[in-house]
Amino acid sequence: SSIVVANHPFGLLDGLIICSIICDVRKDYKILINDEVSQIDQIREYLLPIKFSTLTEDIKKNIISKKKAIEHVNSNGILITFPSGEVATSSLIFNEANERRWKPLIGSIINKTNATIIPVRFFGKNSLLFHTIGFVNNNLRRILFIRELLNKKNQTFKLSIGKKILSLQNERLNNRQIVDKLRSIVVNIN
């Protein structure tokens, strides 16, 4: 069983790229994904939706997805995750886009499995327009996700797969420590 942890510079495209690589080798993968993009019928069977909200109904749905993720990994499946939960963004218009702090949910899943962790780093970022709009209003930025997907047509993308991590269970880290450690590993992959 394996858990892929990756940075998230582009949005939907990151997931499409990883899924296209993995599905050439194995079909038993699931992707932990933002609920907003989990409505695509053709791929719904591969998706475990997560909603980043404090509403009771959303928390209940997240618990179900987390349980399914743990069961999937413990059944020797592959789980693909983008632990930041949102696309990398720039704090100032002309600065580099930075990966947000990772959510401890992935640490919780790792602590309940004995999965091999596969760190993946994507290189690149979305357009200046995307980051400029995000600087003005993060909700407006969401409108540009499809544009960002389409404007990358016929481009080549660079990603690197880091050294696999056989287990973190011996280190006795809490969920936050796990994701902080893995984030550091991913953003430092060359």
Where are these regions (language model features)?
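Non-catalytic C-terminal accessory region of glycerolipid acyltransferases
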Residues: 63-190
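Generic beta-strand structural signal
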Residues: 2, 27-30, 46, 69, ...
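Generic detector of short, locally flexible boundary/turn motifs and exposed helical patches
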Residues: 1, 12-15, 43-48, 82-86, ...
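Catalytic core of membrane glycerolipid acyltransferases/transacylases, capturing the structured
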Residues: 3-58
